[in-house]
A protein has these predicted regions:
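Cytosolic-side membrane-entry/anchor segment at the start of a transmembrane helix
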Residues: 42-50
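Alpha-helical transmembrane segments and adjacent TM-loop junctions that form the membrane-embedded core
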Residues: 76-85, 165, 181-184, 188-190
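Hydrophobic, aromatic-rich membrane-embedded alpha-helical segments
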Residues: 189-201
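Membrane-interface helix-boundary signature
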Residues: 5, 33-40, 78, 82-85
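Polar-ligand-bearing catalytic/cofactor-coordination segments
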Residues: 22-43, 97-186, 201-238
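Structural signal for membrane-spanning alpha-helices in multi-pass inner-membrane proteins
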Residues: 21-25, 54, 58-61, 194
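Transmembrane alpha-helices and immediately adjacent membrane-cytoplasm interface residues
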Residues: 49-116
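Hydrophobic transmembrane alpha-helical segments in integral membrane proteins
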Residues: 1-17
Length: 238
C-alpha cells in the first residue's frame, strides 16, 4: 500500500489554518463561553492530530521508498524525490508557522493576563453549598476556588470591602468555577500551551480559555443573584 502523501499538505494546511483562526476567535465566544471552551479545545486537538498524521505519513513515505529502492534500483531519482517531498512540505509549513507566530505574538502581548494563584493557609469561615469557605488574613482583595481540597478562599480585605449581598455573589461565582471544573480546564489549556509552545496561537487559546471560564462563572452566578450586585462586587477585585 502506497503512503497517502496527499494527507501531508492537507494536514499541514489545517495546522496553518488553525494558527490563523486562533487570534481571530479572541472574544468571539463571550456570549457562549461553554461553546467557546469546547471549540478552542477541538481546534487544537484537531490540529495536533493533523500534525501527528503528517509526520507519520512522512516517515512512512521514507520507509516505503527505501524499500522500493532496494527492489527497483532503476527508479533511484524518483524514489529520492518522493522521499524528500514530505519533508520539504514540513519545512515549508514550519516557515509559514513561524511567520504566523510573529503576528500572533502581538495578540498574546495585548491580551495576556497574569493570574496569581495564592496558596495560603485559611481559617474556616462558613460552608457554602457543601464547600468550605476559608478566610485568609491579608489585606489584598481576592477570592479563589480550589479543587484539592475543594474550598473557596477569600481574603480579609475582600470581606471588609464587600457587602453581604456582594459576598454572596462572589461565593456563587467561585462555586460556578468548581461546578464546571474550570480549574482542570485551565490547567489543560496551559499544558497545551506549554507542549505546543512553538505555536504561539496556543498561548492565545490558554488566555481565552481562562477568560471564558470567568464569563461562564459570571453567568452561573447571575442566575442566582442580582447581576448589578455581581458587577459591583467584581469592581472591587480590580
Amino acid at each position: 500500500m502506497n503512503p497517502p502523501l496527499v494527507l501531508v499538505p492537507l494536514a499541514l494546511e489545517w495546522v496553518v489554518i488553525a494558527s490563523i483562526i486562533a487570534p481571530l476567535w479572541y472574544g468571539f465566544f463571550t456570549k457562549r463561553p461553554r461553546l467557546g471552551i469546547a471549540s478552542w479545545f477541538l481546534l487544537f486537538l484537531s490540529s495536533g492530530i493533523a500534525l501527528v498524521a503528517a509526520l507519520f505519513v512522512a516517515v512512512w513515505s521514507v520507509a516505503y521508498n527505501f524499500e522500493n529502492l532496494e527492489k527497483h534500483s532503476e527508479s533511484l531519482v524518483l524514489t529520492i524525490v518522493y522521499s524528500l517531498a514530505p519533508w520539504i512540505l514540513l519545512a515549508m509549513a514550519g516557515v509559514a508557522l513561524n511567520l504566523i507566530n510573529l503576528r500572533v505574538e502581538l495578540v498574546v502581548q495585548n491580551f495576556k493576563q497574569l493570574m496569581a494563584v495564592p496558596v495560603l493557609p485559611g481559617k474556616h469561615l462558613r460552608t457554602f453549598q457543601g464547600v468550605t469557605v476559608e478566610v485568609v488574613e491579608i489585606e489584598s482583595v481576592f477570592a479563589i476556588a480550589l479543587n484539592r481540597p475543594k474550598k473557596i478562599l477569600i481574603s480579609r480585605g475582600a470581606l471588609t470591602e464587600l457587602s453581604v449581598a456582594e459576598f454572596e455573589a462572589v461565593l456563587w461565582h467561585e462555586y460556578g468555577h468548581l461546578a464546571a471544573r474550570h480549574n482542570a480546564l485551565k490547567r489543560l489549556a496551559k499544558m497545551v500551551a506549554l507542549l505546543a509552545g512553538f505555536i504561539r496561537a496556543s498561548k492565545v487559546m490558554s488566555h481565552e480559555i481562562e477568560r471564558l471560564c470567568e464569563v461562564a462563572a459570571d453567568n452561573y452566578a447571575m442566575k442566582r443573584v442580582d447581576p448589578l450586585v455581581l458587577k459591583s462586587a467584581r469592581a472591587k477585585f480590580q
